[in-house]
Amino acid sequence: MKIAIVGAGVIGVTTAYELARDGHEVTVFERNSAIAVESSFANAGVISPGYVAPWAAPGMPLKVFKHLFSRHAPVKIKFPLNNDDLTWMWYWWRACKLDTYIANRSRMQALASYSRDRLHAITADASLEFERSEGYMVLLRSAKDSAMVQPNLQVLRETGVPFKEISASEARLIEPALNPDNDFYGAVHMPSDEVGNCREFTLLLKSESQRLGVKYELNTNVAGVFYDKFAIVNIANKDTSLFFDAVVMCAGVHSAALLKPLLKPLKRKLPLIPVYGYSISAGVREPLNAPRSALMDERYKVAISRLGNRVRVAGSAVIGGKHDNSPENRNTQAISTLYKVLHDWFPGAAHISNMGASVHEWQGARPMLPDGPPVIGPSGVPNIWLNLGHGSSGWALSCGSARVLADMVAHRKPDIDASGFNIERFS
């Protein structure tokens, strides 16, 4: 089939690759001048299937409220909240029920595990190298932090994910550069998890997909997607309609506006909003003082990753405010938390003294759905497919989501149960 993909982040490019492998003629439309320059650009890079879980969890609304005015809170609400934000929060609150959380967590972790397998298969088949390292450690500042992670660890036991609870001294053997002056409680080590450079992988996979015949139309802003005997893509500022057998929407937060005219007659809703995350990236100052792989500060939900000759610190989630990804809209408190966490654990790891010259501060608009799992599958409109709403887990879920979508397009049964990824759950 002749298939169009809207969006060239990691979700769009992996989808293009899998569809091309199946023999389809694929064209990818991207509004920017390069691929992977939005949510895929500077994320933490962590791939930890056992730690992929919905934000909609029992007790989570109370936690967010309690930290509403905390400077270093992992989740921040920024006022004003528009109607889309309020609708999203209502769905989110409704999904915080225990049975809903357990079901969605199971779906996300199954997809994440499958996605890691697909990532390894693609990496081996195409001989890709993209700043990978193995191992992931969750740092626990106190006994209270340790108690808080026990429910998650029980899930890891039940699902067979290898991990070990270790003391601070054992953690220092794995990560010798941990700050000797930081007297922390302990850690959880997951040796089979990993970290990798999402954007570098996406760029490499773009080249592989082009070898399979995929075409990339950059600087091309899609104004609308329609169906009238064919799937139709309208290009902004051009009196042009392009016809395809199918269209796959992978445009992140921009998908909601493009899909609204299609979904409204069907009385279907897509409560997709941007939740802003942040990262700082800086060159390694002294390798002996830098992390070897990836770690997460459990209290602040901030990840510290080693990506080649750089250290990246990523975290925070800001809901609401002005939906604007410009530098002027950055949350300075969220960014200050990243510097604090880096200094607490690896004070001499990176060149951060001359911030303007050596530190890259990044804000990304994560395309978040309120209940956790992405939407993968048919939209309800003939020949219009969806692969979107992966939120902060896009990198961890990308390769699996792409394969599931490609199997659906081919009317094949996916390798995992994909029934929980449908759009009908928001009706």
Regions found by a protein language model. Name each.
Residues 125, 268-271, 275, 283-380:
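Active-site lid/adjacent beta-loop-alpha segment flanking the redox-cofactor pocket in flavoenzymes
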Residues 147-159, 181-241:
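Helical element adjacent to the flavin cofactor pocket in flavoenzyme catalytic cores
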Residues 103-116, 138-148, 188-207, 326-334, ...:
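Short beta-strand to alpha-helix junction loop
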Residues 42-168:
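Dinucleotide-binding Rossmann-like beta1-alpha1 core, especially the glycine-rich loop
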Residues 163, 192, 298-299, 343-427:
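C-terminal catalytic lobe of FAD-dependent flavoproteins
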Residues 21-41:
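Glycine-rich FAD pyrophosphate-binding loop
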